């Protein structure tokens, strides 16, 4: 046997050992892809849909890096049947999509729009016809502009009742077939990016004396918005519990985005800083949902700017979920901000934690960066995050509702190079392997994993400059869906019925 042959055998064996498959996960573990209405559907002026706060924001110069909008996006509104076939071809078990509130209620309230109901009924039925389970998100950032204009949207507690009515309508219309509901997607990002930094809709902030935003108050508004979201979530959960649970038997969760924060050093101050960082991101929402109150560190540092729950509200919010959705992409180091200079400069909610988040330690980056500068590839963060959720929150049922990475959309890249997305394959393999370790070694109660995303799509402030999809979208030629190498890889992962030892 030649040395070259031996090396080839060893490499092949190593690849086999490191490979991951459906069979490695617990029975009934769900694999799916995720999307959102605004990023996928397009057809913004069809079906009696009303305008949203994102339609408004994209008209402001400089808010989207390539000056694009999602008026067409990937035209999922017209091509959903084709996209369902793509999911089925890969072997996905589920599809997480969001309902556009403004398709159901174009003015935010009133009588439901029959065309909107018909569209989502057709999408749900198309999924079920292929044996794909719908996981439905009720709010993925696209608030009807009418409610923003009428009373200030999420800054006004009046929205709680309107959201519950919207959720009630969806439960009534779709709940006979939808058994997994997600009330809100990434309320942390919505509150911070929309009301603190002002970079996302509705684009409110006060940092640097209103240089970036016309109006807003970055030190208080994110807390008000988050509080109203928690109360709206709880109201929807209790409405389902009271009116639909017995008959429909569905489950309700929330999708919370969370990085893992690793202490910058072994010093107590950095260990405490990392804990605070987790409190101010994941704990901001999960502590009230599990314990009925905000984390003590938030209460101490935000003071009276942080709304408090009444005894009644605390009981309403506490325990108001059947599963926890986690959107996890990346990990950062957390360093104690001794001097509070960031707070002095910014005077906003995001600096209340007294933490300096950083991707660098001793001149070395925590992980390779994807196309987006915030997305550092750190697979072990998945393991540590799952362990944290288990240990702090009593091992609740968890679904990874988003995980993925992006490539840059370079206009002069060769198509064959773009389609060979080995980096994405490695990303998912490594993150899923760490998730599997958390399940096997730590007993973490994880039930599913959703890839962001099936298709390249419109990525908020990044517009069309990055690509997260398993399928390449040819934006210049009829939005043709072209499979990347990751499609074949996922197909093999999901087709594997026997665990590789």
Swiss-Prot record:
The keyword Chloroplast does not apply. Residues 1-19 form the signal peptide. It is an enzyme of class 3 (hydrolase). The active site is at 186 (proton donor), 402 (nucleophile). Its EC number is 3.2.1.21. The keyword Membrane does not apply. It catalyses: Hydrolysis of terminal, non-reducing beta-D-glucosyl residues with release of beta-D-glucose. A beta-D-glucoside binds at residues 39, 140, 185-186, 329, 402, 452, 459-460, 468. Disulfide bonds join 205-213. GO terms for molecular function: beta-D-fucosidase activity; beta-galactosidase activity; beta-glucosidase activity. Keywords: Disulfide bond, Glycoprotein, Glycosidase, Hydrolase, Signal. Glycans are attached at residues 107, 478. One of its GO terms (biological process) is carbohydrate metabolic process. Belongs to the glycosyl hydrolase 1 family. This is Beta-glucosidase 25.
């Amino acid at each position: 046997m030649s040395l070259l042959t031996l090396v080839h055998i060893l490499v092949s064996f190593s690849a086999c050992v490191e490979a991951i498959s459906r069979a490695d996960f617990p029975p009934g573990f769900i694999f799916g892809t995720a999307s959102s209405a605004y990023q996928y559907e397009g057809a913004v002026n069809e079906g009696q849909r009303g305008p949203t706060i994102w339609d408004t924001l994209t008209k402001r110069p400089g808010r989207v890096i390539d000056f694009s909008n999602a008026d067409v996006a990937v035209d999922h509104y017209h091509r959903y049947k084709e996209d369902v076939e793509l999911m089925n071809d890969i072997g996905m078990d589920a599809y997480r999509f969001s309902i556009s509130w403004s398709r159901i209620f174009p003015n935010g309230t009133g009588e439901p729009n029959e065309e909107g109901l018909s569209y989502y009924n057709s999408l749900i039925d198309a999924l079920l016809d292929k044996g794909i389970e719908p996981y439905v998100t009720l709010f993925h950032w696209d608030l009807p502009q009418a409610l923003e204009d009428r009373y200030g949207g999420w800054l006004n507690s009046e929205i709680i009742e309107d959201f519950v009515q919207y959720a009630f309508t969806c439960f009534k219309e779709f709940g006979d077939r939808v058994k997994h509901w997600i009330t809100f997607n990434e309320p942390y990002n919505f509150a911070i990016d929309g009301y603190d930094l002002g970079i996302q809709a509705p684009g409110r902030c006060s940092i640097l004396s209103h240089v970036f935003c016309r109006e807003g108050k970055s030190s208080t508004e994110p807390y008000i918005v988050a509080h109203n979201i928690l109360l709206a979530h709880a109201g929807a959960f209790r409405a389902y519990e009271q009116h639909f649970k017995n008959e429909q038997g569905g489950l309700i969760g929330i999708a919370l985005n969370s990085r893992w924060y690793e202490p910058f050093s072994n010093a107590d101050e950095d260990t405490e800083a990392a804990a605070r960082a987790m409190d101010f991101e994941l704990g901001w929402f999960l502590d009230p949902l599990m314990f009925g109150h905000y984390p003590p560190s938030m209460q101490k540092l935000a003071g009276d700017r942080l709304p408090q729950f009444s005894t009644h509200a605390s009981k309403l919010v506490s325990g108001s979920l059947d599963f926890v959705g986690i959107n996890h992409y990346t990990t950062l180091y957390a360093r104690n901000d001794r001097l509070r200079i960031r707070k002095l400069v910014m005077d906003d909610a995001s600096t209340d934690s007294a933490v300096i988040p950083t991707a660098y330690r001793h001149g070395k980056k925590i992980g390779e960066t994807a196309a987006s500068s915030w997305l550092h590839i750190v697979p072990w963060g998945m393991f540590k995050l799952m362990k944290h959720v288990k240990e702090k929150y009593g091992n609740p049922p968890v679904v990874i509702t988003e995980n993925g990475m992006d490539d840059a959309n370079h206009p002069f890249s060769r198509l064959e190079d773009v389609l060979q997305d080995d980096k994405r394959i490695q990303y998912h393999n490594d993150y899923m392997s760490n998730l599997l370790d958390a399940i096997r070694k730590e007993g973490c109660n994880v039930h599913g994993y959703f890839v962001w995303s099936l298709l390249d799509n419109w990525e908020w402030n990044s517009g069309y400059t990055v690509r997260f999809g398993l399928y390449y979208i040819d934006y210049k030629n009829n939005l043709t869906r072209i499979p990347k190498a990751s499609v074949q890889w996922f197909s093999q992962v999901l087709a594997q019925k026997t665990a590789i030892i």
